[in-house]
Amino acid sequence: MQEKELSNNFLEEQNTFKEDNSPFSDIKYICQASLLITDSIRKGYDVTQLSNGDINVTEIRIVNVHYNWNSEKGKFVKTNQIEFNNNKGG
């Protein structure tokens, strides 16, 4: 009897969640958000999950630019540029 009562309570709560427009009650949202967040953190990115369900991922690129001074032209000249991948996860 207690199991049936628990089951009924669970079903009532599920129906309440279905009426809610929040993505946090959508199992598909939860699964995809978990994958996106986990993958982004594994890559070393900053992740923010907003109260409306939106997710912001901040990727940071590191670019090293080498300039040489050209005395004839009287200015710096770009000689090399290296972009580093911030992918910590492999």
UniProtKB/Swiss-Prot annotation:
Pfam families on file: DUF2671
Name of the protein in its database record: Uncharacterized protein RP215
Protein's organism: Rickettsia prowazekii (strain Madrid E)
Lineage: Bacteria, Pseudomonadati, Pseudomonadota, Alphaproteobacteria, Rickettsiales
